[in-house]
C-alpha cells in the first residue's frame, strides 16, 4: 500500500487540480467518505433511532473543519442530530468558509468552542479547566452575584460556554475530531486539549489524522485526540504507521476521494513510502521444483554466538532454516557449537578459536572463515557474538571481503558503531537491523532522538552509506535511501530477547534464495511478524517465546501461499 508524507499529499492535491479534479471536489468527496463512515457506525445499533443519535463535530478553522462541514451537511439530512463546536474559531480558508455557508443553520446546533487570548489568561489565573466546571446551580449563583467585577463576568461567560461544550460531548453518540490536519507540528492549545480530555462513551472518529499527531514522524503532542477510528483521505500518511500516533488512530480507514491516477506522477522522483502487504510478497516463497536440491535454496553463513550467548546463534540458524535456506553453516566457538549441534543438527559448523572469555578470535580462524564466506550466498553476523577487538576485526573483515550480501545484527552493529565509515568500503550489499538503542549508538545520539525521528534516522543512514536499514520496533521501518516501507505485523509478545536473532536469520535466508536485498528485508520483517502473531494467537503474548516464533514460521508461509494461490 502506497503511503505519503504530508508534503507529498499536498503536491498530489495540487496536481489533481491541474488534471481537472478541484480541491473543492476533493473536499466534497472527503465529506462524503467521512459521512459514510459515521453513518456506517451509527447504523450498527438499530435500537436507537437516528434522530436520537447526536453527532458532535469538533471543527477547526482550516480545511479539516471544512471536511467536517461537508460531512455534517450530508448527515443532517439523514436525520441525525448535529452539533458543531467551532474549536479553532471561525473558518479561515476559502474552502472551509464555502462548506460552512452551505450548512442549514436552522437544523444544526452551534456551540462556540473558541477561547481568545484574553479569556485564556483569565482562565489560567482562575485555574479553571474542563474537569472543574461548576454545575448549573453554581452558575446561577454566580450570575446573581451583585458585586461581580469584569474578570468575574469573563469567568461566568467562559464557565457557561465550557458547560455547553462538555454537556454536548458527554451526550454524544459520535464525536468527530476535525481540529488539526497534516500540518500540525506544535503543542496543543490548552483549551483544545481540555476539550479532547472530556470523558465520554461516544465513538471517536478523527478526520484524516488525529489532532495533535505529527503525520510525518508519528509523534504526538500531550493531550492529542485518541480516536477509535481515523478516516484518512487518499492515502495513509507516514506518521500513521509509527507509534505512538498509530495507537491514537485506532482503526484506520483509507477513503478514496477521487484523486486521478495521473496525480501520482509528482512522486516519480521522490522517495517512495509503502506499508508492506501480502501482495508485495507474491514472489516469495519461491516455487520448489521437484528436481531442486539443497544448493538451489542458498547457503547461509551465520557468524554468531559465544560461550555465554549460545542461544542467539541457535535462533538465527533456526530462523534461516525454517525460512527455506538449503544450507546453513554456523561459525562460532567450541562451547557454542557443542550446544547448537544438539539444538540445530540440520546446520553444519565452523569452529573458531576463542579467548579466555569465550569470544571468537580472528587471526587463527581467518583463512577458514574466508573459505566459508566464499561459498555462502548470504552472511548473517553479530547475534550473541560479543564486542571485543577480535569480533570487531571479524566484522570489518566480513564487510570488506564478503562477495555476497551481509546482514549485520546485534553485536555486529555494536562492533562498527565506533567506526561506522567502514560501511563506505563494503564490498557487497549490506542490511543492518538495529533497534532504537543500537541506532542511537550508530548515530551517537540519545535514544529519544531516534524514537522521535525514526523515519528520518533510517532514511538518512541508508542513503549516506548505501545500505538497507531495518529499524526495528513497533512499525518496523525498512529503508534503502530510495524507498521506505513500514510493517504492521507483529505484537508486543515479541518484545523479548532473541526475536531479533530470528529476524536476522530469516532475512539472510530469503537473500540466499535469490530475492533482492531490499525485498528480502521487507519480506523477512513481514513474515517474522506474521509468525509472531500466530504464536500470540496460540499461546498469548505473555507466554510466547522466540522459539515459538520459529515454530510458527510454517504458519506464515502457509498463509502466504494461500493468499497467492500457490501449492504447498
Where do the protein language model's features map onto the residues?
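Internal gly/pro-rich beta-alpha loop/helix module
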Residues: 173-174, 179-269
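Small-residue (G/A/S/T)-rich helix-start motifs and N-terminal tracts that mark the onset
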Residues: 1-97, 121, 128, 170, ...
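Nucleotide and nucleotide-moiety/phosphate-recognizing core
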Residues: 36-179, 189-207
